[in-house]
Amino acid sequence: AGVKNIVGCDQTGAIYKGRTEHMNWVKEWYANNTNPNREEGTIHDVVKGADVFFGLSAPGVIDTNDLKHMAEDPIVFAMANPVPEIMPEDAVGHVAVMATGRSDYPNQINNVLCFPGIFRGALNCRASRINEAMKLAAANAIADIIAPEELHPDYIIPSVFDRRVAEAVAARVEDAAYESGVARRERATSDTEF
């Protein structure tokens, strides 16, 4: 199990070890740590057979033809905002799960889900900084909001208006701050008020 092959693209195409065009130190690191098969070509080439597309780029980067050539029942996170890499209505019938950064479609993935809770949790314990353990705690808290029996293709992440999210994130972030040693306030004996 686990991710075995990640292929990233930029405006030039696939990022791979040995590529010389439009590279910098970040892309060099990426090339050395992903794309083990050194896939080359455009985004349309490398998305063929892919299980997941995670877009963080620009509107219209992929189309329904690309979705048809992905693996069966692909997952598409088209995060460009306000216009995603592919519009959800264009993906209907071609994907198992679709998510965007937009509030007017199901499965909005937005950092507003984590920030109120992260800040509250950090402030509750007077954390000296926000570290990776606290960020992971926030992500896990968000993931745990939806019960397994509630999950379905249009409900993989809680709404930004779900009041449970900030409280759950704050509690888990505060715990992680104590466990990772960045809390500067003694842990309260009773639950910290939200």
Where are these regions (language model features)?
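Short acidic, glycine/serine/threonine-rich loops at helix termini
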Residues: A1, K17-H22, N65-L67, M87-V92, ...
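Long hydrophobic segments that form regular secondary structure
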Residues: E39-G93
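Adenosine-phosphate binding glycine-rich loop
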Residues: A78-R187
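Short glycine/threonine-rich loop-to-helix capping motif typified by GTGT followed
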Residues: A1, P59, L67, R163-A168
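Long, charged amphipathic helices and adjacent flexible linkers at domain junctions
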Residues: R187-F194
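Glycine-rich phosphate/diphosphate-binding loop of Rossmann-like nucleotide-binding domains
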Residues: A1-A58
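Secondary-structure transition/capping motifs at alpha-helix termini
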Residues: G2-I6, M70-D73, H94, M98
